[in-house]
From Swiss-Prot:
Catalytic reaction equation(s): ATP + H2O = ADP + phosphate + H(+)
Subunit structure: Component of the SWR1 chromatin-remodeling complex.
Coiled coil stretches, renumbered: 461-521
Keyword Secreted: no
Domain Helicase ATP-binding per the UniProt entry, residue ranges: 835-1000
NADP recorded as keyword: no
Residues of the HSA domain: 416-488
Descriptive protein name: Helicase SWR1
GO molecular function: ATP binding; ATP hydrolysis activity; DNA binding; helicase activity; histone binding; structural molecule activity
Length: 1641
């Protein structure tokens, strides 16, 4: 390390540094003290002992020196100085431990001593857990101890030595400060001059001071040593001033204190320059001024420790509390006047202090040298220039001018004078003058430039000194601004900390308040539900009392026979026990247990008369529930009975009905004794009582007759309904006043049946009945506008006319005659339940599962109102746009007697339909859509509607939307909601639907308090649903067992919460599932088919997941980008062509092949190398047979016509010329050229001779036989058949046809590149010319076209469509198996492009199919579905998931195949219900294709969780599905390689509109257009249910929060520190306590 020299001397310097400051005190009067001499001798003795040290002692010294050196180095590196260095702070002798920063410094720089490198190799120790790190270090220490036996002794001795060394240094510092204080006191005492009379007082004071008890420890710190010094006191006695030394506490009272002097000792170390060889680490980065000043010091002085012994600072405090230091003031004044100078420094970061005279002179000389260099560079060398406040290199800027500047001397060598005229007769003088004028202009321009440059330099210098003139003020202002800024930041930080503390305190308080609120809410809920259970049973019994009285008054034998009939007692034992328990509770005679089981004897053994006597006194206990029309005597008797009953049951306030449960002050207490009526009021009450009794008797008489026909009609269907209905019984009816309804109209006579009792009383097929439906109220009321009660219930009907619908007893109503069709048993029960809702003036929700016939039940209800109550309407039915036509067709089919108005069309058409609709019986039923009813809400609000029915009512789940508020204010008598999935997302939606059922005034009268307060409702029932899943599902199963009872797996608390919610919802909701109510319906079996990815799919999937962009996108957390990635992965799983279309392979076409460029050259070279000397036999007439085609006469004529004489004459002449010049040599140019000419002539002569020779040979040819003889002797050949030749030698067209199959089969590999001239090289020229000729005449086509195209363009094989996708491979096998067994399948997919691929797949395999997607029109959809259901020859129907869920009945199919799963499992469930519904006669098998080890397998797990929640909702769940409507990115992407980099972002797919928007943005452009067309119809419904939250209002008013006022006390009690004894503790705790005590406002 670079600090080795310093590290070795650190411990010695530490001791020297600690003792050097006391060197001045050791010498007194030039003599050395004995103490110092003794120390010197001790040090010399130590040096002598070094040589005799053992090995352990040497190692200990090395360790101590090294530790102290590292400690000092850390101090210098961290604080740039050792002014306040405490060696024990980071020493091993420190008991408080070593700082983590020091350990990090040692670790990073590897400043440690190593015993053995191999053993102490800790390179990988940081990657281990903490417990393994400790274990490894312990093992290392053990190995080192085993190897070095002296290690522990060396470490212990080094620690002791280091501790003694550090403590010794600190003790020397304390001794030194104490010695100085004593020395200063002695000097002051020697200078004391006092009269004799004051010396005695001084002596007395010193003596008293000597008896003063000691303060602090004997080994006290430096502060205590300073406090122990005697203080100098000046006493004034008249004119004499005496200075004495004593403690202030010992001063006598007869002295007056004039002033007090205190001495402040100097610091131990004052400057880092006092340490040898110390320099700053980075002079360039920081502390430049300090580094410069240190460099200015003499190098010789830096190698020694400078003795720094300043005199102590004396401070005087006068009587007027003025503190002064006169010596310090004089020193400062002397320094500023003589030694301090401020040089001019052109650096803003250098402060203007700490300059002595030498430093000033040094810096000034440097500045002078710098200015001289700048002057030389700027003015002499002209290499620099002053640009503002910067000195930069000079830039040469050429003047911009349009005039071309030329040098007259260099370019033209002269300046021509300008003269008028064409002639230039200028003389030498003219040229000289012109030259001088031009030169003068040049000098003038240069002079101007010099002037301008001088002005600029002067301006810059002036600006520079102006800036320097205000440098001090500017620096002072900057320092002031910095201080203000620091103060402001500090203030803001403190304020921010207090604000944070206040927020934390507020959060803590809110948590406490929320916890208290939850506790109160649970108590209130428990009390409410307990009282509700008691009073519901009480009202069940009280409803029978008026009937009992009527039976006792009426002695007709018919009624007695009916009541004595054994069928009246066919109800189950469970219901009788409940009735007995209710009566016992009201009478206060007996108690009942939690399950409602009675301890009394069974009422089955009692006769009717005995029962009348037994319950004769029941009226007094339940009178307040019946009517307020009673006499004063009856009220007194009721009051007395109530007083008697209150002593037995204090918890139940029967006089208030259900109002006592909800603490509703608006419900009046009519049963108290405080009511007093006048005479007129009593008379009016009696008249009303008589009138109601007469009307009740007439109604009883009329209903008794109708009950006979009802019973006869019920006997015909008894065989069908025997297995569907449980044991039935009819409790008697009674009426109530409209003012005291509360929840009475909702919960009247409602029985609370436990799960165990349901299993025992209801048939086996109704085991899970409580999972699907809710009870309804039994009491039937109709309140008129004047508050009178019309009793419409008939109590003389047989018990066979009363049935139990899911635990509630409702009246069996007759099937209306207007209804065309037959109702199934459970549909008849639904009609009874709906009729009871109307009779009780209660609204409800029919939440049957999709496919159970909610439409026909609604139509039967309207028909019942028309037939039985003569209520023809008008009724308003609001449905989605896509099913308006379906509703109209259902009305025409099942209830053609109604006038139906389908309200749709343009604004003009709708206005035309509204004309005259206020007339009576203009229409009975109005069917419209959500969108239109909101647009024309003013017209609909002006009309009074009998029933408002909302189909798909779960779409009004948002109570903040404009549509919800608009429909809430419609003028309707009753409301009915139809939904197949009442709870899709959260409990707020359920609250929204329930609140919608009870608008305006019904909220305070007919609803519990919890319904009106969303916060309480959420707090009671809206707990997270993950607890249910933890207990009910393993979460990894592929299939959900819907028949498994989920409640059995819940814990007690969860089961209780579900039971509470059931009790609150039971009057409003009726829900049945197909598997429970429709026993003739076949079973439904679901199969998960895992499909392996094909090789191409796996390659694309892994390639996409391994892309850096994909990892970056998933890790970024951007919502749309993540969805886009997930969509791409789903496309790969569905089919790789959706992600990347298999390309059409084409070859690269080259105009010429590579060999063609050098083929001709190659042939020529080959010909030259293979050239052989050959003899032409034909030219020499040696080819005997070559002349047989010639005639004799032709040969003779040829010989005669031969003319060789001209050639021979020319040859002879050339011979003569050549002979003359044969031996002549060239002697000159002429002879040379003549010789060249003779050589040419000789060559010509040789050619002519060769021509003559060849001509003679050719003309002398003669045949042996001749052509005539050969023709004469030739005989014609026999004509053989050409069939073998034609068989093997085909024509061109025949060869093309024969090779087509070979080309088709074996042309499978497309080359990467093809050459267009290959056919020219392979096909002979003759053949090519013949083909071209025939092609030009259109005789044949190009025979090579197919081979060329087949090789150059390769289209994907159609069979690859199946083999590229694992799902299609599975689908091919599955369809082959299904069609062979006669099954028909529905194939659902989410993506529109998958439908196109499925069409190609079905066409390849030859299956007949039909297609339906979002682009199919509404009128065509019905035709397609009917055609498919009628024609069994069509085995496959492919549909879009969204279009398949919109009012389609496809019972002709018995198999459902989900090619891909929808994000929302509710959509898949709707698709299943299109096949598994009423009319299906075969078992339905559902196959769900899932690509294994992909995103789809993760999606199906989440979908299964939500589907299991569907088994829990409404009956067994905690009614919040937000957990399942959201997906986690990390859960979906199961790739472990990038799982750590992905942000665990939650993706919400709970809303269909949100889902559609996200998918539309994530898909490709082509697929987006196709999906938009496919989802066109869904978009219309989405427009109907589009939420508008801009003008949203809060659904519930939060409860006010109580705030406790801060309690303050008077006097000092408000400021008592209550934490004084325990201590402040952490600052955060102190701030919280400070705020909680109310001091922080």
């Amino acid at each position: 390390m670079p600090e080795n020299g310093r590290l070795r001397r650190t411990s010695a310097r530490l001791t020297q540094n600690g003792t050097s400051t006391s060197s001045s005190t050791i010498y007194q009067n030039g003599k050395r003290t004995s103490q110092h001499a003794q120390e010197t001798s001790t040090a010399s003795n130590k040096k002598r002992k070094v040589s005799t040290q053992s090995k352990e002692d040497k190692l200990s010294d090395i360790i101590v020196d090294f530790n102290l050196a590292v400690n000092e180095l850390y101090q210098l590196k961290e604080y740039k100085s050792i002014i306040s260095w405490d060696p024990i702070e980071n020493s091993s002798a420190n008991d408080r431990g070593i700082k983590a920063e020091f350990e990090e410094f040692v670790k990073n720089n590897d400043y440690r001593l190593v015993w053995d490198k191999e053993i102490e190799n800790n390179s990988n120790i940081d990657s281990l857990p903490l417990r393994f790190q400790k274990k490894k270090l312990a093992e290392q220490n053990k190995l080192l101890d085993d190897k070095f036996s002296i290690r522990q002794n060396v470490l212990a001795s080094s620690k002791m030595l280091e501790e003694s060394l550090v403590n010794k240094t600190r003790d020397e510092v304390k001794i030194e400060s104490t010695f100085k204080a004593i020395q200063s006191q002695e000097k002051a005492g020697s200078k004391l001059k006092t009269p004799s009379q004051t010396s005695n007082a001084k002596t007395n004071i010193r003596k008293s001071g000597s008896t003063t008890p000691k303060r602090g420890n004997e080994n006290g710190s430096r502060k205590q040593a300073l406090e122990d010094q005697d203080e100098i006191i000046e006493l004034s006695d008249d004119s004499s001033v005496v200075e004495i030394e004593s403690d202030l506490s010992d001063a006598e009272t007869h002295y007056r204190i004039k002033c007090i002097k205190k001495t402040v000792p100097p610091p131990l170390v004052t400057h880092p320059s006092h340490i040898p060889q110390w320099r700053p680490e980075n002079l360039e980065d920081g502390n430049r001024s300090t580094g410069r000043l240190i460099q200015l010091k003499d190098s010789s002085s830096s190698s020694k420790i400078i003795n720094f012994d300043p005199t102590p600072l004396e401070i005087i405090q006068l009587k007027d509390e003025v503190i002064a230091a006169p010596k310090l003031t004089e020193k400062l004044q002397n320094f500023l006047n003589n030694d301090f100078k401020t040089p001019i420094i052109d650096e803003s970061n250098v402060p203007d202090y700490n300059f002595t005279r030498d430093e000033y002179n040094t810096i000034m000389s440097q500045q002078e040298k710098l200015l001289r260099k700048l002057y030389h560079k700027v003015n002499i060398e002209n290499s620099l220039e002053l640009n503002g406040d910067k000195i930069e290199r000079r830039k040469v800027i050429l003047p911009q001018s349009n005039i071309k500047l030329t040098d007259p001397f260099r370019n033209t060598f002269s300046v021509k004078p300008k003269l008028h005229g064409a002639a230039n007769n200028a003389t030498h003088q003219d040229y000289l003058l012109a030259q001088g004028m031009a030169f003068s202009k040049v000098h003038q321009q240069m002079r101007k430039q010099h002037h301008l440059r001088t002005r600029k330099i002067a301006a810059m210098i002036d600006q520079h000194f102006k800036k320097k003139k205000g440098e001090k003020e500017r620096l002072a202002k900057e320092r002031e601004q910095n201080l203000k800024k620091m103060s402001r930041l500090t203030m803001q930080a403190v304020k921010k900390r207090w604000n944070q503390a206040q927020k934390v305190y507020q959060i803590i308080q809110n948590e406490k308040e929320e916890e208290l609120k939850k506790i109160k809410g649970r108590q209130h809920l428990s009390e409410m539900l307990e009282h509700s259970t008691q009073l519901l049973e009480a009202q069940l019994t009280s409803s029978r009392e008026p009937t009992v009285e009527a039976e006792s008054d009426d002695n007709s034998t018919t009624f007695d026979d009916n009541t004595n009939d054994s069928d009246n007692f066919s109800s189950s034992e469970e219901e009788e026990n409940e009735e007995d328990n209710t009566q016992q509770q009201i009478n206060g005679n007996k108690k009942y247990d939690v399950n409602g089981k009675s301890n009394d004897e069974n009422d089955m053994s009692l006769s009717v008369e005995e029962l009348r006597k037994k319950y004769a006194d029941l009226e007094t206990s339940v009178e307040p529930l019946s009517s307020n029309v009673t006499s004063d005597k009856e009220r007194e008797s009721e009051t007395s009975s109530e007083d008697a009953e209150s002593s037995d049951d204090d918890d139940t306030d029967v006089t208030r009905g259900l109002a006592s449960l909800y603490q509703n002050d608006e419900v009046a207490d009519f049963a108290t004794t405080t009511f007093e009526y006048s005479a007129e009021e009593k008379k009016l009450i009696e008249d009303l009582n008589q009138e109601s009794d007469s009307r009740m008797n007439s109604l009883l008489d009329s209903d008794s007759v109708s009950s006979i026909s009802d019973s006869e009609s019920s006997e015909e269907s008894s065989s069908d309904t025997e297995m569907d209905q449980s044991n039935v019984s009819e409790p008697p009816r009674s009426s109530e006043t409209g003012s005291n309804t509360g929840l009475a109209s909702l919960f009247t006579n409602g029985t609370i049946v436990s799960d165990e009792e349901d299993d025992a009383s209801i048939s086996s097929n109704f085991e899970n009945e409580s999972d699907e439906s809710m009870n309804s109220s039994d009491r039937e009321l109709e309140v008129n506008g004047n508050g009178k009660i019309d009793k419409i219930a008939s109590t003389d009907e047989d018990d066979s006319n009363v049935e139990i619908v899911n635990g509630s007893k409702v009246k069996d109503v007759p099937i209306p005659s207007l209804l065309r069709g037959t109702l199934r048993p459970y549909q008849k029960q639904g009609l009874n339940w709906l009729a009871s809702l109307y009779n009780n003036n209660t609204n409800g929700i029919l939440a049957d599962e999709m496919g159970l016939g909610k439409t026909i039940q609604t139509i039967s209800l309207l028909a019942y109102l028309a037939c039985e109550h003569h209520k023809w309407g008008p009724h308003l039915i609001i449905v989605p746009t896509s099913v308006m036509l379906n509703w109209e067709m259902e009305f025409k089919k099942f209830a053609p007697g109604f006038k139906v108005l389908t309200y749709y069309g343009s604004p003009q058409q709708r206005a035309q339909k509204r004309k005259g609709w206020n007339k009576p019986d203009a229409f009975h039923v109005c069917i419209t859509s959500y969108q239109l009813v909101v647009q024309d809400q003013q017209s609909f609000k002006r009309r009074r509607w009998t029933y408002m029915i909302l189909d798909e009512a779960h779409n009004i789940k948002n109570f903040r939307s404009t549509r919800w508020r608009a429909l809430l204010n419609f003028n309707t008598e009753n409301r009915l909601l139809l939904t197949g999935t009442p709870l899709q997302n959260n409990l707020m939606e359920l609250w929204s639907l329930l609140y919608f059922l009870m608008p305006s005034s019904k909220v305070n009268q007919a609803m519990p308090e919890g319904f009106a307060n969303l916060d309480d409702f959420q707090q009671w029932f809206g707990k997270p649903v993950d607890r249910i899943l933890e207990q009910t599902s393993a979460g990894n199963s592929d299939l959900i067992d819907e028949n498994e009872r989920t409640t059995q797996k819940m814990d007690e608390e969860t089961r209780n919460t579900v039971a509470r919610l059931h009790q609150v919802l039971r009057p409003y909701l009726l829900r049945r599932l197909k598997k429970d109510v429709e026993k003739q319906m076949p079973g439904k079996y679901e199969h998960i088919v895992y499909c392996r990815l094909s090789k191409r799919q796996r390659f694309l999937y892994d390639d996409f997941m391994s892309r850096a962009k994909t990892k970056e996108t998933l890790a970024s957390g951007n919502f749309l980008s993540i969805i886009n990635c997930l969509m791409q992965l789903r496309k790969v799983c569905n089919h790789p062509d959706l992600f990347e279309v298999r390309p059409i392979v084409t070859s690269f076409a080259m105009p010429r092949s590579i060999p063609s460029y050098y083929q001709s050259t190659n042939e020529l070279v080959k010909r030259q190398f293979n050239k052989d000397e050959k003899v032409s036999f034909q030219a020499l007439n040696l080819d005997v047979t070559g002349c047989e085609n010639m005639n004799y006469f032709v040969c003779q004529s040829t010989g005669k016509l031969m003319t060789t004489e001209p050639f021979q004459d020319q040859i002879n002449k050339l011979k003569i010329l050549l002979v003359e010049f044969e031996n002549s040599d060239p002697i000159n140019y002429v002879s040379y050229y003549q010789r060249l000419r003779r050589e040419e002539q000789a060559e010509i002569k040789e050619k002519l001779e060769h021509v003559v020779y060849l001509n003679n040979l050719r003309c002398g040819r003669k045949p042996i036989y001749g052509e005539s003889l050969l023709r004469l002797l030739t005989v014609n050949a026999h004509d053989f058949s050409d069939e073998p030749y034609n068989k093997y030698c085909l024509t061109l067209s025949g060869r093309v046809d024969k090779m087509n199959d070979t080309i088709e089969k074996y042309s499978i590999i497309t080359p990467a590149a093809v050459a267009l001239d290959m056919k020219d090289q392979l096909i002979p020229i003759s053949t090519k010319q013949r083909i071209l000729h025939e092609v030009a005449e259109n005789k044949i086509d190009n025979p090579f076209h197919k081979a060329q195209v087949k090789l150059s363009i390769a289209f994907p094989d159609k069979t690859l469509l199946q083999y590229d996708c694992g799902k299609l491979q599975k689908l091919a096998t599955l369809l082959q198996e299904l069609t062979s067994q006669g099954h028909r399948a529905l194939i659902f997919t989410q993506m529109t492009k998958v439908l196109d691929i499925l069409e190609q797949f079905l066409n390849i395999h030859g299956y007949r199919y039909m297609r339906l997607d979002g682009a199919t029109k509404i009128e065509d959809r019905q035709l397609l579905t009917e055609k498919f259901n009628r024609d069994p020859k069509i085995p496959v129907f492919i549909l879009s998931t969204r279009s398949g869920g919109l009012g389609i009945n496809l019972t002709g199919a018995d198999t459902v195949i989900f090619y891909d799963s929808d994000w929302n499992p509710a959509m898949d469930k709707q698709c299943q219900d299109r096949c598994h519904r009423i009319g299906q006669v075969r078992d339905v098998h559902i196959y769900r294709f899932v690509s294994e080890y992909t995103i789809e397998s993760n999606i199906i797990k989440k979908a299964n969780q939500k589907r299991q929640l569907d088994n829990v909702v409404i009956q067994e769940g905690e009614f919040t599905t937000d957990y399942f409507g959201k997906f986690s990115v990390r859960d979906l992407v199961s790739d472990s390689n990038i799982g750590k980099e992905i942000t665990d972002r939650t993706i919400d797919f709970s809303g269909d509109a949100k889902m559609g928007n996200v998918l539309a943005q994530a898909e490709d452009e082509e697929d987006r257009v196709a999906a938009g067309a496919a989802l066109k119809e869904v978009a219309i419904d989405d427009d109907d249910f589009k939420e508008e939250t801009r003008s949203a209002t809060t659904g519930a008013t939060p409860a006010p929060t109580e705030t406790n006022a801060l309690s303050t006390t008077d006097g000092d009690a408000a400021f008592i520190d209550v934490d004084y004894e325990d201590g402040i503790g952490h600052i955060d705790e102190y701030m919280l306590r400070f705020i909680s005590d109310g001091y922080y406002l």
